[in-house]
Swiss-Prot record:
Residue window of motif Secondary area of contact: 93-97
Pfam families cross-referenced by the UniProt entry: Cystatin
Record protein name field: Cystatin cpi-2
Entry similarity comment: Belongs to the cystatin family.
Signal peptide as annotated in the record: 1-25
Highest taxon listed in the record's lineage: Eukaryota
Organism from which the protein derives: Brugia malayi
One of the record's GO molecular function terms: aspartic-type endopeptidase inhibitor activity
Lineage: Eukaryota, Metazoa, Ecdysozoa, Nematoda, Chromadorea
Amino acid sequence: MMSTMSIKEGLLVILLSLFLFDTTALIHRREIPHMESKGQMQRGQVLLGGWQERSPEDNEILELLPSVLTKVNQQSNDEYHLMPIKLLNVSSQVVAGVKYKMEVQVARSECKKSASEQVNLKTCKKLEGHPDQVMTLEVWEKPWEDFLQVNILETKVLSSV
């Protein structure tokens, strides 16, 4: 016969769960909203698993950018490789790995695509006469699996000045 949990045991389980939740947040140095806030977060609080703004100068992200552009160029039907000009905005979310939302200013380079050769975008020069673009990308990285997925969410052509 199955035994039922007493009220005291149930309360103990709830209290233990809340303690573990607060401890996990503390370990990860993240602030959590209190139960009484009824879903409203205060300035400076971070939602666990939520999106966080990142600096476009963050070395971790700058090191990832060439691989991201390689994936973008694989998806593009353009005859020329796109090259990064400037990383405009970045936010990240911890999931099974890390998801990034990036806004990257890119330009068409003088380097033509060829199935047989690997291109180093750092050596490519900007192809003049073509406007830059701002691409909004969603990037999912799981480095322990050597996994990188890039989705192009939006592309805007910048008007030439």
